[in-house]
């Protein structure tokens, strides 16, 4: 039987290390959440993208998400709201509806008005912390900078990593780049909102919040 050379052993060691690192990265990118009980309520919170501007109320992503996951989904979208305003409003909605799960999609109006990205990041982080401090599980929807064909800022992923929560970095960016899924330059149409709802439901399943 031929002897295994030091070079081969070294290569095997590198391959093993690479495999381990990939597994660790995979685990890090897939946060785990507690399964939602049947009576659990979901709060979708944000601005006009959550409200459903550009489509009928029953075609908004919260309405479509409710049909997909068989949980009550409260639409907490307020058109025109900045992240600073959302931070002030969130506590009221958490107190009133007592959700077990929060889908947070905020920052669009900060970007449209060229407000501070650092302040938007601070506000989104504060909203996530507020929910987590109350025992509410959270998922982030990353918002791209409209009209610039640029991906969402890195702070969404950084906040998700800090709090070990899921984040969808692609769905809204993908919808906005496809004119067939848009009602105007900023808001999706019914098809676009439907795709958002499906992506969110799948992400909730992947995290363990929903049964597959």
Language model features by range: what are they?
Residues 2-15:
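Bacterial N-terminal signal peptides that target proteins for export
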Residues 23-26:
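C-terminal motif of bacterial Sec signal peptides marking the signal peptidase cleavage site
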Residues 28-82, 89-98:
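Serine-esterase "nucleophile elbow" of acetyl-processing enzymes
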Residues 52-56, 81-84, 114-115, 146-149:
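Acidic-and-aromatic substrate-binding clefts and catalytic sites of carbohydrate-active enzymes
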Residues 68, 88-212:
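Alpha-helical cap/lid subdomain in secreted, periplasmic
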